[in-house]
């Protein structure tokens, strides 16, 4: 087998090696969320389909696949169908630059951090197109809310990424992880980590910032007119973005695949396992926040983004760069 033939086999295999575990992770993340929320609310949660409800994601998936796809008569059909596919594809494409272990990455770009930021910014287009093409006032209002919310919090996320970038001197995600061998950035930059995680909640439209799909006022928001696989793709995209943002928190602040302590017994555990454990920790925080906190008002959400996080993240950029220059610690 020549080199070209090997490449045609290896590249799709690597892509499937990322997509299939991600889809499985999304399926069982939904189950985990329902179980954790049930525990918080002192009830059982799903436990009928399979042992301990383990087959519940399969039943939910089959239900959505077998439903009839209904489109509004006044909708723009091509854009209406394209929007959920675009949203889901963007959530998958972002994983190309995420390193699970040293060397275990599909494409180790030198601008990996910038690439992830660009992909997360493009996600708003799928939502805007979905709201506009549905030709429904509720869907369009939800889409406008989502666009305003995502753009607002992308500003503070960008400044936080600059703070980490100043500490490392590189946009390569593998180099950012290796720079945390002595100390994780989450320890000296703990307030930045908290701001970044809260901004990720707003960026992924998760509670308590799920204003775009506020059921009480917007009847589920931008995806109100979607059924069957259209709704399922938006759903999968949201949860895939949750896992992606948890992975980004892990890479930037918790040392990625590096073990918790620099001990021989911990070094025997594969880096991908450490990475997964840290991602699961952030996913648990996502679920816990949803179960524990009420939804913000829209003006409170915007005020938090522009009046609190923007000046704070800007102040951290200035203070971190000042400390590094003063003590000659610049990379």
Swiss-Prot record:
Keywords: Electron transport, Membrane, Mitochondrion, Mitochondrion inner membrane, NAD, Respiratory chain, Translocase, Transmembrane, Transmembrane helix, Transport, Ubiquinone. Pfam families: NADHdh. It comes from the Eukaryota. GO terms for molecular function: NADH dehydrogenase (ubiquinone) activity. Its main location: mitochondrion. Exons b and c and d and e are cis-spliced, while trans-splicing reactions are required to link exons a and b and c and d. Core subunit of the mitochondrial membrane respiratory chain NADH dehydrogenase (Complex I) that is believed to belong to the minimal assembly required for catalysis. Complex I functions in the transfer of electrons from NADH to the respiratory chain. The immediate electron acceptor for the enzyme is believed to be ubiquinone. This is NADH-ubiquinone oxidoreductase chain 1. It comes from Oenothera berteroana (Bertero's evening primrose). The gene is ND1.
């Amino acid at each position: 087998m020549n080199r070209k033939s090997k490449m045609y086999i290896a590249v799709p295999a690597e892509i499937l090696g990322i997509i299939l575990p991600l889809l499985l992770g999304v399926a069982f993340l939904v189950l985990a969320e329902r179980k954790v929320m049930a525990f918080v609310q002192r009830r059982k949660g799903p436990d009928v389909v399979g042992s301990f409800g383990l087959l519940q994601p399969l039943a939910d998936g089959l239900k959505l696949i077998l439903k009839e796809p209904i489109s509004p008569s006044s909708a723009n059909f091509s854009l209406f169908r394209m929007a959920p596919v675009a949203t889901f594809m963007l959530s998958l494409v972002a994983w190309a630059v995420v390193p699970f272990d040293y060397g275990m990455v599909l494409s180790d770009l030198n601008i990996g951090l910038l690439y992830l930021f660009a992909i997360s910014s493009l996600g708003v287009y799928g939502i805007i197109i979905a709201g506009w093409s549905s030709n429904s006032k509720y869907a369009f209002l939800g889409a406008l809310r989502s666009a305003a919310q995502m753009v607002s919090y992308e500003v503070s996320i960008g400044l936080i990424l600059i703070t980490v970038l100043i500490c490392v001197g590189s946009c390569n995600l593998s180099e950012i992880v290796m720079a945390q061998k002595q100390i994780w950035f989450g320890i000296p930059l703990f307030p930045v980590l908290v701001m970044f995680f809260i901004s990720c909640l707003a960026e992924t439209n998760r509670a308590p910032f799920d204003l775009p799909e506020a059921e009480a006022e917007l009847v589920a928001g931008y995806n109100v007119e979607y059924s069957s696989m259209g709704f399922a793709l938006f759903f999968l995209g949201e949860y895939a973005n949750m896992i992606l943002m948890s992975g980004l928190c892990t890479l930037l602040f918790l040392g990625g695949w590096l073990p918790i302590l620099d001990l021989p017994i911990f070094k025997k555990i594969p880096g991908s396992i450490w990475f997964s454990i840290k991602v699961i920790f952030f996913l648990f925080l996502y679920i816990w926040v949803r179960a524990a906190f009420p939804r913000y008002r829209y003006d409170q959400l915007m005020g938090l983004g522009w009046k609190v996080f923007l000046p704070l993240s800007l102040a951290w950029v200035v203070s971190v760069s000042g400390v590094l220059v003063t003590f000659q610690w610049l990379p």
